[in-house]
């Protein structure tokens, strides 16, 4: 993510840095218009940490008292975590976090819905390339395999 390099530049040369995820204003507005009406009292964002943190901030700009937790299977930097944020080790950790944390809304890759059997909350699709790869860039399974170079 570049954090290691940014921290070295800060330490060695005093160059300040900030974390964030650049998104065009129009794309951000459209995204927020789509998700805000669907958010419950406790939202869990399952994604890459810096992007998830950015979405958390967007939500709080509109709903200052919103309870928003970030979780993911990929490395999470401790200095960028808030209380309640979690690094997940396995799929069962996601279901446990949702149930134990009384989460009523999840933003995550569509494939992760399967890891929440019986959960009755609102699931909002937020594709994550390392989870589902090319699946969201094609219409059918046949298109996927064709794009992957298989001829069947």
Where are these regions (language model features)?
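An N-terminal assembly and electron-transfer interface module characteristic of large anaerobic redox
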Residues: 1-152
């Amino acid at each position: 993510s570049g954090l290691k390099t940014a921290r070295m530049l800060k330490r060695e040369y005093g160059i300040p840095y900030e974390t964030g995820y650049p998104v065009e204003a129009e794309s951000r507005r459209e995204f927020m218009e789509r998700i805000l009406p669907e958010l419950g009292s406790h939202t869990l964002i399952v994604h890459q940490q810096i992007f998830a943190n950015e979405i958390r901030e967007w939500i709080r700009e509109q709903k200052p008292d919103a309870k928003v937790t970030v979780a993911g299977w990929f490395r999470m930097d401790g200095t960028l975590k808030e209380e309640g944020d979690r690094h997940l080790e396995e799929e069962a950790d996601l279901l446990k976090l949702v149930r134990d944390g009384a989460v009523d809304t999840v933003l995550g890759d569509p494939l992760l819905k399967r890891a929440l059997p019986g959960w009755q909350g609102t699931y909002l699709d937020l594709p994550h390339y390392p989870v589902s790869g090319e699946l969201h860039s094609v219409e059918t399974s046949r298109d996927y395999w064709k794009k992957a170079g298989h001829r069947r």
